[in-house]
Amino acid sequence: VYKRQAKERMVALVKNLQESLGERVKGLAWMGDSTKVKALEKLATFHVKIGYPDKWKDYSTLEIKDDSYWANMERTNEWNHAEMVAKAGKPVDKEEWLMTPQTVNAYYNPTTNEICFPAGILQYPFFDMNADDAFNYGAIGVVIGHEMTHGFDDQGRQYDKDGNLKDWWTDEDSKRFDERAQVMVNVFDSIEVAPGVHGNCRMTLGENI
């Protein structure tokens, strides 16, 4: 059962891990000062979503009938499509969630620079209100750190703090990042996942980072 106190505790966990990641960024010997400033700005402006949205999506115009599952799916898909098309030309709603609260997952969205942790994942074994911080840092803390890092992986680093597709790295720092990423690519590509079949780290680099 999701409790309000879970959000309060998650807010504290996220804040502490933001600060910790910030210290790691400051200590990077290979990253220049100008890129560090931009990275820290992006980290500090993460839009954090926890539990469930403050504004629920209005489904009042969606018709669910007892005719057939297929027909209900058709109507639902049509409704979703119409809702998406209606957003064209309008300001981006940064309060909109891309996952339902009951989803056991989390995400980082580079176009809004947000990290989201639905109520569904705030339960054992990822999170336990009755456990001490050590347990939760070792469980949900891994998920929090994972999503934060997506903001600076091979894909996320291409977006700025406002979610714009904009290069905020110096050429030298970008080159150094690619050199370090290539080391990881080489390691994962050398893994034989099945007889005669090797991994393709370029396809999974963001997750591997």
Predicted feature descriptions by range:
Residues 4-209:
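Intrinsically disordered, low-complexity linker/terminal regions across diverse proteins
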Residues 1:
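Active-site loops and adjacent core secondary-structure elements that bind or stabilize anionic groups
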